[in-house]
Amino acid sequence: MMNWNQLISAKRFGMEEFHEERQENRSEFQRDYDRLIFSAPFRRLQNKTQVFPLPGSVFVHNRLTHSLEVASVGRSLGDDVAKALLERHPELQDSFLPEIGSIVSAACLAHDLGNPPFGHSGEKAISTFFSEGKGVRLKEKQPNGEQLSPMEWEDLTHFEGNANAFRILTHQFEGRRKGGFVLTYTTLASIVKYPFSSSLAGTKSKFGFFVSEEESFRKIATELGLILLNEHPLKYARHPLVYLVEAADDICYQMMDIEDAYKLKILTTEETKELLMAYFSEERQEHLRKTFLIVNDVNEQIAYLRSSVIGLLIRECTRVFLDHEQEILSGTFEGSLIKRIAERPAAAYKHSVEVSINKIYRSRDVLDVELAGFRIISTLLELMIDAVTSPEKTYSQLLIDRVSSQYNINSPVLYERIQAVLDYISGMTDVFALDLYRKINGNSLPAV
């Protein structure tokens, strides 16, 4: 059984021997939040696709605005859960339990840092390059004798943004300090939705850390008392706060995708209202209709409905977490919080997901971005991987010289060189990736 006193630690990854209490008003977890907000990888999220093409005449969500909204919802979830837990466990009043809102909020900011350009099509382009594309050749022993281990190969064929985020936050890149972002152990553990290695990824290609960061996660998990479920391959029970980060993400992406689809006229006003009203009881729906007689601006009505649904889902997910606290602490809770909410909102949420799949994610604009992104990422990967596996070629060196010095592109280890390419490409914005693709293909030249 995990316990709250051990689960919430202010110890910083990479600075364990230097840990000391700071004389300032900010808590260590608020420092995590601020450190993320001011980081370059976080800023780059403003030019990474969430779902819809960027930018357009109608401003829609990108990865940055999405992450900020998830952090806001995550803070509310964390604060509500902390308040209830302190009433339930008054002996924890002097612990870090009141900081749950700050921890979840910081973890929410970081949850998408590892996503490559062009949304999920970028992730798919990377994994399929190795499983189906020209990267397949790397599974075999190379002419110079280099060979990837089975676990390294699993990492590549199941490339996952969540695992990549953990790498960005913890890996010591060239010329950078030990511990990556040097975040607290608890914030780091709270972003790992799938706390197991890639060999357990299965058909959904979900896992929490690459083999290169396995020992880092093991260190964090041991410190926080996460339950070890399997040694080889490595698998732990989730940190309890992961459920709150996941719930905040589930709430936001579903609500914001619907709102964006409405703004882009993929969904009509009536369709949007119907989707959102379905979350509420008949009595509450009647109250909302009366409110709309006063607030007759349609956009304001949709925004009010959206915020009301978010409030409802926060209360529901908080209730589910508290109802199942013991299962969560024992590592036996299965599924997500959103899947355990009350019947009416659960049915409305399920219907929202179905509409999103059928009408939003399959809309022409969304598919066009996915197709273009897949092509761009695949091409960049093909050229860059060829460069690091055949560096003796003249053209290879030209490509290698483009890569930032923080990436270990000249490592003597094949896996590390491939990872350096993935670090470089996954860190690109949509615009940077497109610009590089055009230049490499001779479709664009630098202005003189």
Regions found by a protein language model. Give the residues of each.
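Acidic, low-complexity proline/glycine-rich segments
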Residues: Q30-R43, I341-P345
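A short small-residue
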Residues: K48-V58, V355-I360
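Hydrophobic alpha-helix feature that most strongly marks membrane-spanning transmembrane helices
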Residues: C252, M256, D260, I314-Q326, ...
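Substrate-recognition/cap regions that form aromatic- and gly/pro-loop-enriched pockets
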Residues: L322-S404
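C-terminal amphipathic alpha-helical interaction region
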Residues: S390, T394-L445
